[in-house]
Amino acid sequence: MAQNFTKLNPQFENIIFEHDDNQMILNFGPQHPSSHGQLRLILELEGEKIIKATPEIGYLHRGCEKLGENMTYNEYMPTTDRLDYTSSTSNNYAYAYAVETLLNLEIPRRAQVIRTILLELNRMISHIFFISVHALDVGAMSVFLYAFKTREYGLDLMEDYCGARLTHNAIRIGGVPLDLPPNWLEGLKKFLGEMRECKKLIQGLLDKNRIWRMRLENVGVVTPKMAQSWGMSGIMLRGTGIAYDIRKEEPYELYKELDFDVPVGNYGDSYDRYCLYMLEIDESIRIIEQLIPMYAKTDTPIMAQNPHYISAPKEDIMTQNYALMQHFVLVAQGMRPPVGEVYAPTESPKGELGFFIHSEGEPYPHRLKIRAPSFYHIGALSDILVGQYLADAVTVIGSTNAVFGEVDR
């Protein structure tokens, strides 16, 4: 008996060619080593030029927002590590900041100092990681090796503080879990010196490298209008000349007390963005050097004092009956924030990372929404890549510094 087989034709989004002479459809990813995660791009080519780019995401979707709606507020904290996993502490802090805003908590000053140090340390680790991988994409392997060596020292500091090198879980709602270990600040000072030396070395290898500049200059140009229409933030926005940094515009923690600049670009191309990452490393070093002397002038508490939402110190839990009962209720049932909603933006290494939380007074959020910068930057590829050569697609994708843990969520 003859079998009827239905021939399946590939379907692409609105791909119609008037002339087939010099045109081609190319699938880029989702397993391509330069796609920086699970990115699939459907590229329409005319010769070597891209005439249309259609990003397809979702290959790393894990339902992170829905998970948050089915966990207590404290239970969800480790899950935030898995968003932008190259700077986990930034995710931890953004979530904690949103919950603290909802609870109207006052954070002890020592915890604020430690948090700001950790945020800027993570910013440097994330930036040096981007520069090394971006250079490797373009073909500069030596930079990758030197930068990763220095990054390891930063990861050692994070491991000394919280016990983890990648998924840190280093922030708590109401403060931080630990005080700084002995001699940790001395190790931090040494790391700052090593980071300066590494930055000089990288600049020596790249800034006057003719091939590097030819591959990046006038490639992946983003205009101010394009950046605003796509909702870009961070260096993708500042590279166009718009000086918008949430640490300056809506300061949190100790940023309003710190002296630092917001570098901006002139041309909005990939080379401008590389330069801004290098300049922001300098600003992070400058911020940490202001924070180190502040630490010694702070009192010892590292967690907020509020029995409705925050457990008492461990010594009180072990010696006082009421503190033990309060701790048991918070762990077993979870805190119950007031009814309301809040959106708290922060300046992560990638751009504006914010958490929206709608509370109905239950131990878990009624709605949790994550505003991740990489999601918007990947969407903008459909504009940025048009007119670029296929050989430059890897450079453009890399210069967005997107991490797919926070794109797909």
Curated annotation (Swiss-Prot):
GO molecular function: NAD binding; NADH:ubiquinone reductase (non-electrogenic) activity; quinone binding
Membrane topology annotation: Peripheral membrane protein
Compartments, record wording: Cell inner membrane
EC number: 7.1.1.-
Pfam families cross-referenced by the UniProt entry: Complex1_49kDa
Lipid metabolism recorded as keyword: no
GO cellular component entries: plasma membrane
Catalytic activity: a quinone + NADH + 5 H(+)(in) = a quinol + NAD(+) + 4 H(+)(out)
HAMAP family assigned to the protein according to its UniProt record, in alphabetical order: NDH1_NuoD
Subunit text: NDH-1 is composed of 14 different subunits. Subunits NuoB, C, D, E, F, and G constitute the peripheral sector of the complex.
Stated name of the protein: NADH-quinone oxidoreductase subunit D
Organism: Helicobacter pylori (strain P12)
Gene name linked to the record: nuoD
